[in-house]
């Protein structure tokens, strides 16, 4: 059955709960207009039969529901620091055909696969979450550490809008700051540094003239 477990508490968690206490009810409806690349990321997961998928910062469960439809044999897991958002995820994922989902209130910067009863995950998804996590580099490290050998980390997030007009870029980033969102300039460099360190590989693809960035980080088979 779908289950929610608790295990996180911080000022960041409190801030996210306050922000999403009411927003969570309209989150999916509004975000589809500017969180681009999420469906592309899901379609490219190529989850092995019976494989495990963790979404870090799973929010309302929108992506996990689509992953279940696209890969019906996958075992699904989700974590989020906001208990408010996970309440929406539980409602969305608590349907009979989505009962293989385990949800946990947890900090993206400090989690382990063993907390979910797993030794590692075949796929990890982080969709538009790193731009909201203060210690986002630590979250990247935790996700990489939680991958199975041969597994992959899939990231979609705001880019630097590097090929879009400067006025648009400045306006968008000012608007995003109102919601505690900061596009990470060094995300590609941080991921590449980790890949070089561990002998892994990284694929980087900007979309929408740099509006968003997609990454696929592949762990080497050990």
Residue positions per predicted region:
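A short acidic, Gly/Pro-enriched loop at the edge of an enzyme's catalytic core
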Residues: 109, 113-124
């Amino acid at each position: 059955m779908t289950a929610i477990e608790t295990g996180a508490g911080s000022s960041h968690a409190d801030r996210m709960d306050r922000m999403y206490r009411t927003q969570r009810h309209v989150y999916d409806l509004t975000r589809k207009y500017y969180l681009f690349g999420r469906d592309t990321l899901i379609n490219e997961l190529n989850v092995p039969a019976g494989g495990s998928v963790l979404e870090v910062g799973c929010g309302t469960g929108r992506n996990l529901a689509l992953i279940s439809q696209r890969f019906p044999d996958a075992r699904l897991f989700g974590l989020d620091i906001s208990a408010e958002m996970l309440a929406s995820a539980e409602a969305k994922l608590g349907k009979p055909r989505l009962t293989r989902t385990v949800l946990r209130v947890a900090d993206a910067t400090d989690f382990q696969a063993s907390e979910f009863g797993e030794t590692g995950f075949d796929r990890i998804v982080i969709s538009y979450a790193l731009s909201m996590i203060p210690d986002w580099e630590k979250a990247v490290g935790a996700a990489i550490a939680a991958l199975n050998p041969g597994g992959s980390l899939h990231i979609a997030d705001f880019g630097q809008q590097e090929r879009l007009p400067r006025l648009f870029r400045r306006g968008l980033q000012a608007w995003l700051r109102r919601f505690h969102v900061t596009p990470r300039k060094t995300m590609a460099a941080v991921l590449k540094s980790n890949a070089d360190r561990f002998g892994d590989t990284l694929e980087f693809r900007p979309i929408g003239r740099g509006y968003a960035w997609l990454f696929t980080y592949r762990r080497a088979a050990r």
